[in-house]
C-alpha cells in the first residue's frame, strides 16, 4: 500500500490485526530502498523498553506511548515532516549548485551522488531512459520512481532533466560554453525548451545565470552569493 500511495509519513500501532505487527511493518519499510526515506512513528500501549528498543533498531523514527495527547502526536508529525522538507531542500540545492550546510544522512548524499554520476555518464547514450537508469541503480523502475519522488519531490523524468540542466550550468560556468552549446551537450535539441526549463529550475534565465555566477563559482561546484 505504501508503494502505491507514496505517503509522506506512516503511523502504525505496534499491535495490529493480521500476520504483521508494527515492528515488522517498520522493518519492511526501512529495508525497502524505495520506501526507507518515509518516516515511521510507532504507537504502543506498553512501557516495555525491550519492545521499544526493537522498534528503534528496526529504524522507527519516533515512538509514542499510549495514551497520548493529540497535540504531542501532531508536534512529532510536524517535526518529522519538517525534516522531510529539509531533505528535499538539500536535494534541490545540490541539483541547482547552491551551497547547503545542513546535515543529511550519508545514505541520501550517496544516493544523490550515484544518480548524478549515472545520468552524467549517459548524456550521450541514446539508449538511456528511465528503465536503463533504474537498472544502473540496481533498483526496479517503480522503486526508483518512488524513491526519487519521495526525497526530491520530482518525478523521475523531471529529476533526470534537472540533472542534465545541472551539468549544462557547470559547462556554461566552467567551460565557457554558450547556451546553445551547453544545451546540445547535455541532450536538449530544442534550445527554447532548454531555456524555459532552466529558468524554472534555477530561477534565472541561462544568460542571467551566467552573468551572475561565472566569476563566483567555487571548486566544490557551488555558486557563491
Identify the residue ranges that each predicted region occupies.
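Basic/polar phosphate-binding segments, predominantly the helix-turn-helix DNA-binding elements
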Residues: 130-159, 183-205
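Active-site beta3 strand of CheY-like receiver
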Residues: 5-11, 16
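A Lys-centered signature of the CheY-like receiver
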Residues: 64-66
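C-terminal output helix
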Residues: 68-77, 89
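Alpha4 helix (beta4-alpha4-beta5 surface) of REC/receiver domains from two-component response regulators
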Residues: 20, 24, 31, 36, ...
